């Protein structure tokens, strides 16, 4: 039997549902709405295996903040009402046949990346349900990303249209241009257009730095901020070596009776 693993970026989904509620203290409405959303995802994707991955609730920003101290330093804490309602949300999803994986100090995206990469590398189908374009660096013939809210696939044609690059160049792109919302600086003075120009000419940051053909207008910036770009790329990248502590059989989807 062919495997189709669906991984739900849980807080990505829950926060969007919660922010759309007229009364954001009404957690039962969030439970009900996310339940309907999960049922639609199940119908659309028809998984053989499924899991929802949750970030830990702590303000600990994980290993990325050790590399870049300003990383997500202004991240707003989860609203108190929503935090208190997380157990109810997880319980409602469990009743729909979906188990939860809670990170313990690791960011959810690294857990998602590790599991997705592990299964996709065995030529099994994986779908990540998330609006987070960061997952697009994982794209492969057997790994895809579904933006449920925009009803679109974040696939290679999307990346080509959005960034003009290949998925495997995205971390280098963010290493150069930065991600302002996460306080990933990149190289000061190099924005999206310059990053695209550089990565169209060279496959990686290292290749650009080592080449005599790097345009002069960028050479001084590279000389000054090359190490910063490498660190920013590391933080923008995804780890795929997290210890998961379970196997695929543990998350086989069984439709509740």
UniProtKB/Swiss-Prot annotation:
Comment on bound cofactor: Binds 2 Mg(2+) per subunit. Only one magnesium ion has a direct interaction with the protein, the other interactions are indirect. Binds 1 K(+) per subunit. The potassium ion strongly increases the affinity for DNA.
One GO MF term attached to the UniProt entry: magnesium ion binding
Ranges where the record places region Interaction with DNA: 189-194
Domain of life where this protein originates: Bacteria
Keyword Nuclease attributed: yes
Keyword terms: DNA-binding, Endonuclease, Hydrolase, Magnesium, Metal-binding, Nuclease, Potassium
EC number: 3.1.-.-
Pfam family, one: 5_3_exonuc
Alphabetical list of HAMAP family matching this protein: Xni (MF_01192)
Listed PANTHER family: 5'-3' EXONUCLEASE FAMILY PROTEIN, FLAP ENDONUCLEASE XNI
Family to which this protein belongs: Belongs to the Xni family.
Identification of the protein by name: Flap endonuclease Xni
Organism of this sequence: Aliivibrio salmonicida (strain LFI1238) (Vibrio salmonicida (strain LFI1238))
Organism classification: Bacteria, Pseudomonadati, Pseudomonadota, Gammaproteobacteria, Vibrionales
